[in-house]
Amino acid sequence: HKEYRRQRQMCIRDSTNNDYGKGLADVYVAAVKAHGISVTTVTAHEEGKGDYGAEVATLASAGGDALAVLGYLDQAGGSIIEGSLDSGSFDTFVLSDGMIGDSLTDRFGKDLNKSFGSLPGSTGKGAGKFAEVAKAGGIDSSGPYTGESYDAAALITLAMQAGGKGDRATIQANVMDVANAPGKKIYPGAVS
């Protein structure tokens, strides 16, 4: 994203104070540094607090052109954005997938015009085929994990076909065989 490349310094406010949040923050730090952007601080937060003013003040004192908020939209992440906007600490936010949703723009509107985020997914042949199949079925394929959910359902279906039954044990016994080589690539829309 072009805005990402314009940043010189970035604060990273990681997801909840747990192993997932730490791992996600580590990935973001590596990506930011790979683009020549310095990281001014990386801090974790606890979910469920009523006020994140102290956390926002800590982030503001570290400085930066943008604040990466790697949290959950309707929990602490949204409150940290709100506190940052209210205090004038940051006006550009880099958002992880857990921070992206309609309630974000409903809550902050144009205040997020400089902000951007990332969603998991791929851009290969399978992604294009899935977008076509989803559109034909009236499904919005742009949401997080939509394509991956389709893939998971297809693997479960193929594992049941391979084992001849639809029970848990059959799926477990066959899923790795249908998901890995040798085999035939099956693209979205071809599972029946």
Regions found by a protein language model. Name each.
Residues R5-Q9, R13-S192:
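Extracytosolic ligand-binding ectodomains
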